Amino acid sequence: MIRGERVIGILAAGGSGQRAGVAKQWLVLGGESVLRRSARVLAACDAVDGLVVVVPPGDEARGEAELAGLGKPVRAVAGGPARADSVRNGLAAADGAVVLVHDAARPFASAALAGRVAEAAARDGAALAALPATDTVKRAEAGAEVPRVLETLDRRTVWLAQTPQGFRRAVLEQAYAAAGPSASAATDECALVEAAGAPVTLVPGEPGNFKITGPDDVRRARALLEAPVATGVGYDTHRFAPGRRLVLGGVEFEGDGLLGHSDADVCAHAIGDAILGAAGLGDLGRHFPDTDPRWKGVSSLALLREIAAKAAERGWRVGNCDVTLAAKRPKIAPRAEEMRARLAGALGISPAQVNVKATTGEGMGFVGREEGVAAHAIALLVRAAG
């Protein structure tokens, strides 16, 4: 509240994301949707008492579920054919004397900025976050096939509009009424208030408060929100089983094999587990359970190919992996380079990005008793470009 008056945040999330090629509000960045991140800006503002989220028709339940747990009551309503229509629907559902309208595709605004806009709106009737232009601004003829400069504007008079934009409810309602059907053409709410002849206060905005509009903005947002690298650790053991093939790192060795549902390639399994861990995808058993006949006797290199593909779906590629085998037998060093090549081929990377080494465990434990083989692995994943 401000001066005892309720303040309601309206999230404009009714668009289809046509310019970005995706429904921007549902895009997940850094483990959280853009909509939820933008809503958190308003929810974290002490002045805001509740939220109204305007979503595409039919997505009301999804919108409310997406914003659950933010600490403020949430109501979802259906949007209209244009932004101004959607905000009008949100305004009708808001029960505050002051409203803050915020783009659902601006997740980087601060709660402090929202508070300053709300305070100015309560005091002056209408306010918006904006940045003074720092570049020289040219005016050109709209829609010209070959754009040409008509004039150079005095950049001291030019401000670049952001959101939140705040209003006394009555001021915004009167602006909509004055505009009539032409309100749908407005690209922001302050334009309606200006057209109605009411003053609008400029509140200094934030340079990082950009709107996710196109693919370049998505990439910029990902770079800010998602870690460029991730690491995972894998561990696996298998006991020796006479009569089975012994496969390590995709290479067949002489001697008793290892017991397992697949080919029991403990080296590949540890690497796969490390990659799954780095990508936040659980473990090997979740994806390739020993109850599934599809994986019976299969080469573990095939599992690695599947795992690399699953990581790629999450936007990751394998940067490098390092595996240590603990085994009294067989001798690994003579065939380590061959193992590196096989593992790298399955992962779609260079052998230079794979390291294989071994230890005998100094004769201790089940390895020292030659009961089986263990493998420890670490994998580094790198965020894929684009």
Swiss-Prot record:
Pfam family, one: IspD
Region span, 2-C-methyl-D-erythritol 2,4-cyclodiphosphate synthase: 230-386
UniProt site (Positions MEP for the nucleophilic attack): R155, K211
Annotated EC: 2.7.7.60, 4.6.1.12
SUPFAM superfamilies: IpsF-like (SSF69765), Nucleotide-diphospho-sugar transferases (SSF53448)
Associated pathway: Isoprenoid biosynthesis; isopentenyl diphosphate biosynthesis via DXP pathway; isopentenyl diphosphate from 1-deoxy-D-xylulose 5-phosphate: step 2/6; Isoprenoid biosynthesis; isopentenyl diphosphate biosynthesis via DXP pathway; isopentenyl diphosphate from 1-deoxy-D-xylulose 5-phosphate: step 4/6
Cofactors (names): a divalent metal cation
Catalysed reactions, as listed in the record: 2-C-methyl-D-erythritol 4-phosphate + CTP + H(+) = 4-CDP-2-C-methyl-D-erythritol + diphosphate; 4-CDP-2-C-methyl-D-erythritol 2-phosphate = 2-C-methyl-D-erythritol 2,4-cyclic diphosphate + CMP
Site (Transition state stabilizer): R19, K24, H261, T360
The protein's role, per its UniProt record: Bifunctional enzyme that catalyzes the formation of 4-diphosphocytidyl-2-C-methyl-D-erythritol from CTP and 2-C-methyl-D-erythritol 4-phosphate (MEP) (IspD), and catalyzes the conversion of 4-diphosphocytidyl-2-C-methyl-D-erythritol 2-phosphate (CDP-ME2P) to 2-C-methyl-D-erythritol 2,4-cyclodiphosphate (ME-CPP) with a corresponding release of cytidine 5-monophosphate (CMP) (IspF).
UniProt cross-references to NCBIfam families, sorted A to Z: ispD (TIGR00453), ispF (TIGR00151)
Protein name in UniProt: Bifunctional enzyme IspD/IspF
Lineage of origin: Bacteria, Pseudomonadati, Myxococcota, Myxococcia, Myxococcales
